Amino acid sequence: MRILFVHPNYHSGGAEIAGNWPPSWVPYLAGHLKKAGFDDIHFIDAMTLNVSHDELRKKFAELQPDLIGVTSITPSIYEAEETLKIAKEVVPNAVRVLGGVHATFMFRQVLSEAPWVDAIVRGEGEEIMVELAKCVSEGRWPEDRASIKGLAFHDGTEIVATQAAPTVKDIDSLKPDWSLIDWKHYIYIPLGVRVAIPNMARGCPFTCSFCSQWKFWRDYRVRSPKAVVDEIEDLVNNYDVGFFILADEEPTINKKKFVEFCQEMIDRGLNHKVKWGINTRVTDIYRDRDLLKFYREAGLVHISLGTEAAAQLKLDLFNKETTVAENKEAIRLLREADIFTEAQFIVGLDNETKETLEETFQMAWDWQPDLANWSMYTPWPFTPLFQELRDQVEVFDFSKYNFVTPIMKPKALTRGELLDGVMKNYRRFYMRKALFHYPWRGTGFRRRYLLGCLKAFLKAGVGRTFYDLGKAGYWGPQTKDTVDFHFDETRKIAEAQVADWEAAADRSRKHKERQEALRAQMKDRAADRNTANFVMPADAEDEFDLSAETHEARSAEHAAMACGGGKDQMVDAAE
């Protein structure tokens, strides 16, 4: 059986300004499928190679796949749907599957607007795809599709979601097949070397209200440091990778394993062969201040910090457990350790003004990170913050949910004024850095890296790809009143998806009511126990067993929920 994976052709001028990034989802899925005996696997990176729809038709006709898998984040969803629509035209007998975070949580929306999609994989895909491939290869599709956990599909006029599949418990068992990647296309511009995106863990124990990763991966699992370094050694020695970014939301959460990972990199001499970067939190920088130089020795050269907002009000709204002062100190600590710092700011909520935009610039310049990014607040439609702000959302064209297009309109600014304010911050920050910092700060690697970053910005700016400025028609302050973001106003939320949201909100409300009632009951019982005439109920020993074993079990259950585990992620269809 022939399996074809396609990465949809979507561009927005965001992270791609630093280079082309290899789609890691393909090697991880392919590796697990090959382990199960499916070895006829092909891959088309339509994004990196800018493959047109006509070229896709030709490739589909040539390959004649039996199973086609496409992924999608929110902004690329329409292109992913169109890719599978083309597949239906050219290879109608192929089973068409869509996965990724957007399809996982918005499956009713996707199946309503793209009925030609045969199935949606909900959640991490390795084990689900193996079961689906077996079903197709054994001729049991579509009759037995309902027996596969983690799918959603049309059954007549109904949209059906099967029971949620369990997460992959032993993630060390996942062996990605990097040979499917044509590595010459994936270059990290600042260093001019091949780049990869392996991962050390899945999930995140934090529940930031604007993020979806903790919901998608459901529980937090960390790989063996040795297994991760084995994978990196393979990438370096066999595919000539010179830079990698760990795909984790925060690889430093588990300090013990991160330290072991760094030591393993040093022990194998990989710190002299490959440089790398991570995303992490300010709190971890504080915690590890005495280890930062050790991390640098292990090859860690670039840390992107989720400082998120200059105003503490925004940090609180995003559930960020840091303060403005801590952000500044974290950047200073990294600078002392000779680790490049990238500060991330989120702008564009309803309380944004010209003054708050100016505040983020002044704060960025005061903190002096090596790099600064201003991202438009993008309300992922499956996050808690979206539900809180739902009445304020006017744009449902998901192709614009890309961190560079102002989805939300601030009360005091037009979208054009917001974009102009962000560009003003970029111009001032990088012009000053280019003139007074990058060419003169440090020697050797530091200078080369900073000038390489400047090259990436200039290349995207001259080509008008940065921040989608060319598409929007922005050429400077004089055009802020004429920019056109080309929102497709015909895009609406499907009735089935709205009903799903309302049902989820109702479940959440009832769960909260039960919790509040239980707290009140426990409070009343505690008050009763303090009275002189209190008599313990006959069944109290079972109900209030406070043995060490019970306490430990309850603590573990609570911890899982606090980390975003369990039913807060992906509710089974039966519930």
Swiss-Prot record:
Start and end residues of each Radical SAM core domain: 190-417
Pathway: Porphyrin-containing compound metabolism; bacteriochlorophyll biosynthesis (light-independent)
Gene Ontology biological-process entries: bacteriochlorophyll biosynthetic process; light-independent bacteriochlorophyll biosynthetic process; photosynthesis
Stretch list, region Disordered: 504-525, 551-575
Keyword vocabulary terms for this entry: 4Fe-4S, Bacteriochlorophyll biosynthesis, Chlorophyll biosynthesis, Cobalamin, Cobalt, Iron, Iron-sulfur, Metal-binding, Oxidoreductase, Photosynthesis, S-adenosyl-L-methionine
UniProt KW Cell membrane keyword: no
SMART domains per UniProt: Elp3
Listed EC numbers: 1.21.98.3
Chemical reaction(s) catalysed: Mg-protoporphyrin IX 13-monomethyl ester + 3 S-adenosyl-L-methionine + H2O = 3,8-divinyl protochlorophyllide a + 3 5'-deoxyadenosine + 3 L-methionine + 4 H(+)
Residues the entry annotates as binding [4Fe-4S] cluster: C204, C208, C211
Role description: Involved in the tetrapyrrole biosynthetic pathways leading to chlorophyll and bacteriochlorophyll (BChl). Catalyzes the anaerobic formation of the isocyclic ring (E-ring) in Mg-protoporphyrin monomethyl ester (MPE) to yield protochlorophyllide a (PChlide a) via a six-electron oxidation and the formation of an oxo group at position C13 using oxygen from a water molecule.
Family assignment from sequence similarity: Belongs to the BchE family.
Database matches in NCBIfam families: BchE
Protein's recorded name: Anaerobic magnesium-protoporphyrin IX monomethyl ester cyclase
Name of encoding gene: bchE
